[in-house]
Amino acid sequence: MHLTRLNIERVRNLKTVALHGLQPFNVFYGANGSGKTSILEAIHLLATGRSFRTHIPKNYIQYEADDAIVFAQSATEKIGMQKLASGEQLMKVNGDTVATQGQLAKLLPLQHIDPQSTDIIDHGAKPRRQLLDWLMFHVEPEFYFAWQYYSRALKQRNTLLKTRRNLSLADLEPWNKMLSDYGEILHSQRLSIVEQWNVYFQNDLSQLLPDLEIELEYSPGFHTEQGLMQDLLNQHQKDIERRYTEYGPHRADLRLKTPFGHADDVLSRGQKKLLIIALKLSQIAMLHASNKETVVLLDDLTAELDLTAQQRLIERLSQLGSQVFMTTLDHASVKKHLHDLSISYQLFSVESGQVSLAAS
């Protein structure tokens, strides 16, 4: 879904923003604190229901306002989100209220590329698992269904473990069965997708880090040779003592292995940034191969990447048919890249929360 129109109300210092005739590349420039990253934040809020900067709605809803609103339109769809300071939200697709955030996310596949961040590599398994599950959600039709049932069973099992001390195997049996059934499905789905993803990943890795050997290695979170049910049975007493479920797909990881060790231990900060970009580009490539258009948020492109890496990234996103919303302090460099690559774009100036069309 490529956006032709974007309206933002009361997100941080953006009181009212109305953008029309959006292009494949949309570049926002201005001083630090002007509000340009808040535009990306608003698009992220629409697609995911949350900000990439804070988990607390009142932190991004304008001071003394009760809500924030984001509306977007493509050639065929209209989607909107009202977020209240309480955290409640109202979502609409083509004028009809929808119940789940997933319905908006399916229409608006979105990737956020922050060249300054190395969280996916340095901050443990959770962000890597989330990265994998973003891909699963968009390319594996049955994933969301299986994940919902697995998550429900995990929540119920953990609640029992936290609230009751003398649990028998019989007490946990219904949840063990559901965890095992749906956990094995999730494992099979993830394993298949990681194998496919690795092919795309190697292509983008070779463009950004041609001298590095890195493999994606999926760690399932349980002992697959004996199966999840056996792990749950074997860990029965220890789970009671821990008060949570130790084994299962919720503990899975996506390991990034080099011939010299794991990426978090052996790569430089600069290499880690390019590795994360390669991971996300390869995911976008997988969606592109299945005729799905991705919206990409690219924050502060020129701050961390050299000119060659900047141009390679812009060119690759254009090849993949992505619609890009990017921020920069150095719009002259970005304009040159876009002109050199003959890419259609719009340039916007952002100053104190006011957004205006600038000369391209």
From Swiss-Prot:
InterPro entries: DNA-binding_RecF, P-loop_NTPase, RecF/RecN/SMC_N, RecF_2
Family to which the UniProt record says this protein belongs: Belongs to the RecF family.
Native species: Acinetobacter baumannii (strain ATCC 17978 / DSM 105126 / CIP 53.77 / LMG 1025 / NCDC KC755 / 5377)
Coiled coil segments of this chain: none
Residues that span the membrane, as ranges: none
GO molecular function: ATP binding; single-stranded DNA binding
GO cellular component, one term: cytoplasm
UniProt function note: The RecF protein is involved in DNA metabolism; it is required for DNA replication and normal SOS inducibility. RecF binds preferentially to single-stranded, linear DNA. It also seems to bind ATP.
Protein residues bound to ATP: G30, A31, N32, G33, S34, G35, K36, T37
Name of this chain's protein: DNA replication and repair protein RecF
